[in-house]
């Protein structure tokens, strides 16, 4: 089950389509969907979590808590929409594209992809780009 929760005024459009997309990416990697909770929040909310749970006193766009068991993919993914907006501006992409990239980034971590080394970062980017193409295809069908 995939749920979308909001700790800010932000609200996703096309929740159903995004849920199907995330499910498809999970299945494409030979995994099963568990309970995935997206929590959209602001910088202050995510900074508090970053300090409390990771002992990092820095802003970030995403924090994910992985509860995956074997092939069952699940966890809580906290996303700062403020940080996503700033990053979109820095990377010269739309807010929506950056948000979708960050959303799937958390799931890819649950599937087993890392971004700790330059090589694994390249692979993560490839996986994100492939997932974004899947979303484009899915949205053109609907």
Language-model features and meaning:
Residues 104, 108-112:
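Short active-site segment of divalent metal-dependent hydrolases/proteases
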Residues 1-99, 111-142:
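An acidic/histidine-cluster motif and surrounding catalytic segment
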């Amino acid at each position: 089950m995939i749920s979308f929760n909001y700790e800010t005024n932000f609200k996703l459009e096309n929740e159903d389509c995004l849920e199907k997309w995330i499910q498809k990416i999970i299945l494409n990697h030979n995994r099963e969907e568990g309970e995935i909770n997206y929590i959209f929040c602001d910088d202050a909310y995510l900074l508090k979590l970053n300090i409390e749970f990771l002992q990092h006193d820095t802003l970030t766009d995403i924090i994910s808590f992985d509860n995956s068991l074997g092939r069952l993919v699940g966890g809580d993914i906290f996303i700062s929409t403020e940080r996503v907006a700033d990053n979109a501006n820095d990377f010269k992409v739309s807010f929506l594209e950056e948000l979708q990239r960050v959303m799937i980034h958390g799931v890819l971590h649950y599937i087993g992809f890392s971004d700790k080394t330059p090589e694994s970062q390249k692979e993560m980017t490839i996986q994100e780009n492939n997932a974004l193409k899947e979303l484009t295809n899915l949205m053109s069908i609907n």
